[in-house]
Amino acid sequence: MSFTFRQQIIWDRKNSPAVAPIRYLPNTELIFWLTKTPCQPNFERAKSPLFVGEVWQFSAKPNPLHPAPFPEELPTNIMMCIKDKTEDFVVYDPYAGTGTTLKVAKSFGLKYFGSEINSNYCRLANETLNGTLF
């Protein structure tokens, strides 16, 4: 399976760095926009003008279930800009964590799948998708 790299987006977590006792506290995360086919997003749908540049700055709320949580607004904004492509659009989250991205994809009626190496997070993601966690 091959993908075309479209853009890298940087999420500046502001004052909410991910907890990582093994390295300097990371306060940014990278988002890679990859597509299999050409895709023309509608940036006018973005919930905020802060989300149309390549650096997004907003804080995450602490989550005791995961050391690097992010709010639903992050995947929501991306999916709002491409939501017309529901028939062939698939969301893949290679680091699914507690399932936030998958939950948002499900709410948009998009096809989705995720990968997660940590079995506890897999369980939490399933609970998120089944509506029993959050």
Name each region found by the language model:
Residues 107, 126-134:
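Short, conserved SAM-binding/catalytic segment
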